[in-house]
Amino acid sequence: MERTFIAIKPDGVQRGLVGSIIQRLESRGYQLVGLKLVQVSQELAEAHYAEHRERPFFPGLVKFITSGPVVAMVWQGKGVIAAARKLIGKTNPLDAEPGTIRGDFGIDIGRNLVHGSDGPETAQREIALWFQESELVNWTPATQSWIYE
C-alpha cells in the first residue's frame, strides 16, 4: 500500500486547523498510520529542506518550520501521494482551488499550512527522516472493504 508524509506546519497548528486537515484525509478514505506532535530541530529542518539549501528562501523555510510545533503524519492508501497533493492544493494559497486545504484556509505562500510528499521517493525519504519504523502502526480499518475492491 502506498504511503505519504504529511506535515501540518506551525501556522496550521497555531490556527487550530489540525482536526479539519486530518478529517479531509480520513473522509477521503485514507488511513493514518503515524502521527506525532514535534518541535522541529534545526537539524531536522535542514535535512527536510535539503534540496532547497542553495535557494535564497532556505533560511526562511528553516526558521518558519522551527518556529512552533508541527504535526507529522504518515498516511497510506491507493494513490495517496497524488490524492493528498490535490487535497492540499497549489503551493501559493492564492492560486489554490477552492475546496483544497490551501484554497480554503491559506492566504500567504510563506504560511501555506501543510506539506505533502511530491512523489514515492520523496515520501520514503521524508517518512524515514521523521519517523522510526516502530512509530508506524499497521492496522486494518473496519471500513476497508467499503473503500477498496
From Swiss-Prot:
It comes from the Bacteria. PROSITE patterns: NDPK, NDPK_LIKE. GO terms for cellular component: cytoplasm. Keywords: ATP-binding, Cytoplasm, Kinase, Magnesium, Metal-binding, Nucleotide metabolism, Nucleotide-binding, Phosphoprotein, Transferase. InterPro entries: NDK-like_dom, NDK-like_dom_sf, Nucleoside_diP_kinase, Nucleoside_diP_kinase_AS. ATP binds at residues 9, 57, 85, 91, 102, 112. The active site is at residue 115. It is found in: Cytoplasm. It catalyses: dZDP + ATP = dZTP + ADP; a 2'-deoxyribonucleoside 5'-diphosphate + ATP = a 2'-deoxyribonucleoside 5'-triphosphate + ADP; a ribonucleoside 5'-diphosphate + ATP = a ribonucleoside 5'-triphosphate + ADP. One of its GO terms (biological process) is UTP biosynthetic process. It is an enzyme of class 2 (transferase). Coiled coil: none annotated. Major role in the synthesis of nucleoside triphosphates other than ATP. The ATP gamma phosphate is transferred to the NDP beta phosphate via a ping-pong mechanism, using a phosphorylated active-site intermediate. Belongs to the NDK family. HAMAP family: NDP_kinase. NCBIfam families: PRK00668.1. PANTHER family: NUCLEOSIDE DIPHOSPHATE KINASE (PTHR11349). This is Nucleoside diphosphate kinase. It comes from Synechococcus sp. (strain JA-3-3Ab). The lineage of its organism: Bacteria, Bacillati, Cyanobacteriota, Cyanophyceae, Synechococcales.
